[in-house]
């Protein structure tokens, strides 16, 4: 499924929010995998976590595969841990990234217990949102990345979103965070490969010249900004290499070193 969807995403490039990309991926996944139990903390329409194939679990009818948890992120996260502990089921639940603080105790337990729980966190920046600074995450990503045995993914387009979901589902002993945008993003992947590049942690998406003056590392929505900035700098003969870094987990360290070989005189910038 994932390889076919990646190929289709490259052949049909569109400006999409990664929350929408996640919904498209989930539509394909829930059609095939009936062990996925979805849900949201009263934000299903904003998180794009419910698919057309899913049936809501209701009082007196537990045959469904989607839970409306209500406005209670902490309760949702604890219930997802319980579902994962039961076995043979993969729970995922959605909220805004700013509300990950309410989920934090259960996220830590997911990591400690080595359970495959997937947290879909949307509206992941100050880029777009009608609710103002109370709903704009700033320090949350750093806090989540500091938790051992937790995948934190911030994809930059539809292809990366598919790859992050693929990696999260294969991480049988590690919970995952998918940090997703509300605003639309231009596609960054132009050519198809069977390799899941997001599993590498970091990889090159643009090089404006063989002689590089600046390497820009970016994730999520800022990859688009890094690419746009690189093209503008090239007009002033300042040449850049852009590295998409959807994950900062240890698996990426080796690949990060590979991007340090151009020259020790090359400046490096982390944009997020």
What are these model-predicted stretches?
Residues 49-55, 108-109, 190-192, 251-257:
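Short glycine/threonine-rich loop-to-helix capping motif typified by GTGT followed
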């Amino acid at each position: 499924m994932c390889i076919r969807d990646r190929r289709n995403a490259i052949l049909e490039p569109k400006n999409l929010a990664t929350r929408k990309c996640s919904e498209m991926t989930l539509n394909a996944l829930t059609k095939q995998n009936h062990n996925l139990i979805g849900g949201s903390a009263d934000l299903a329409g904003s998180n794009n976590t419910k698919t057309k194939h899913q049936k809501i679990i209701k009082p007196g009818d537990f045959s469904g595969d989607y839970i409306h948890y209500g406005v209670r992120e902490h309760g949702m996260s604890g219930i997802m841990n319980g579902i994962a502990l039961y076995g043979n089921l993969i729970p995922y639940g959605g909220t805004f990234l700013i509300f990950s603080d309410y989920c934090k105790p259960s996220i830590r337990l997911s990591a400690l217990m080595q359970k495959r729980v997937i947290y879909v966190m949307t509206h992941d920046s100050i880029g777009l949102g009608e609710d103002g600074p109370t709903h704009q995450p700033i320090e949350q990503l750093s806090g989540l990345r500091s938790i051992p045995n937790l995948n934190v993914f911030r994809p930059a387009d539809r292809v990366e979103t598919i790859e992050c979901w693929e990696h999260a589902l294969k991480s049988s002993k590690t919970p995952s965070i998918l940090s997703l945008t509300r605003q639309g993003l231009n596609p960054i992947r132009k050519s198809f490969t069977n390799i899941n590049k997001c599993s590498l942690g970091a990889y090159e998406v643009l090089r404006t010249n063989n002689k590089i003056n600046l390497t820009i590392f970016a994730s999520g929505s800022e990859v688009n900004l890094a690419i746009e900035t690189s093209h503008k700098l090239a007009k002033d003969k300042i040449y850049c290499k852009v590295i998409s870094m959807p994950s900062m987990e240890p698996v990426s360290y080796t690949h990060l070193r590979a991007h340090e070989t151009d020259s020790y005189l090359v400046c490096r910038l982390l944009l997020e």
